[in-house]
């Protein structure tokens, strides 16, 4: 949240799905607008986007930090013809295995033009509304949005880097996590049940 203001955001909306910590209070004290919403992430993001007033939207996970000048970089990309995109990614933790994971993720997004949610997806607000926002899925909502926009030829991966948490890779292991992610992607494309995919992700 602080990184969003530091990156130049004029409006920061925090969606709280019923947390029991001090998230809402801290967000308000920092100058953000707080919305209490559903626990389903895609629905929370859609509610926040509906109330946003800017011409562009940046969806920032709680454990992801925007770089200085990140908002200006988004506006520049949108002014240059992009309608959707994300940033390169770096993990906050120092472990060597995370450097490998970063390279894999950044290579994947550069090739596919499908940034995931932890890469701070951005989109023109009018385009987001025309598309009907995120599909209300328990998982893959960020990937599904990226897939819909990839065919436009106007998706952009910015050279600037967001910092995010690598705790999932550290807790579950690099190759196990990567293998699980690719299995979920493959099953999603094969028409797998998203509720089952969400369970697979949480295991």
What do these predicted regions represent?
Residues 1-9:
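Short, acidic, metal-binding catalytic loop of nucleotide-sugar glycosyltransferases
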Residues 3, 16-24, 64:
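A conserved acidic beta->alpha catalytic loop
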Residues 22, 42, 60-76, 147:
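Acidic donor-binding/catalytic loop of UDP-sugar-dependent glycosyltransferases
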Residues 29, 36-52:
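Glycine-rich, basic loop-to-helix element that forms the pyrophosphate-binding segment
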Residues 57:
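Short aromatic/hydrophobic "clamp" motif used to bind/position activated sugar donors
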Residues 68-97:
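Conserved donor NDP-sugar-binding/catalytic core segment of glycosyltransferases
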Residues 139-145:
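Acidic donor-binding loop at a coil-to-helix junction in glycosyltransferase catalytic cores
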Residues 147-203:
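Hydrophobic helical membrane-anchoring modules
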């Amino acid at each position: 949240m602080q990184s969003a203001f530091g990156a130049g955001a004029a409006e920061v909306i925090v969606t709280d799905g019923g947390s029991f910590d001090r998230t809402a209070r801290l967000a308000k004290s920092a100058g953000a607008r707080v919305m209490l919403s559903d626990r389903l992430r895609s629905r929370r993001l859609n509610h926040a986007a509906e109330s946003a007033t800017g011409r562009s939207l940046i969806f920032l996970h709680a454990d992801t930090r925007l770089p200085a000048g990140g908002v200006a970089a988004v506006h520049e990309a949108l002014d240059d013809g992009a309608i959707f995109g994300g940033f390169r990614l770096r993990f906050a933790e120092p472990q060597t295995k995370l450097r490998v994971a970063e390279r894999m993720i950044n290579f994947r997004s550069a090739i596919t033009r499908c940034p995931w949610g932890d890469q701070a997806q951005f989109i023109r607000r009018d385009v987001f509304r025309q598309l009907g926002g995120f599909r209300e899925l328990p998982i893959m909502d960020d990937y599904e949005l990226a897939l819909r926009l990839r065919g436009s030829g106007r998706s952009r991966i910015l050279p600037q880097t967001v910092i995010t948490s690598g705790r999932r890779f550290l807790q579950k292991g690099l190759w196990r996590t990567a293998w699980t992610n690719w299995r979920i992607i493959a099953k999603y494309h094969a028409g797998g049940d998203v509720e089952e995919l969400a369970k697979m992700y949480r295991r």
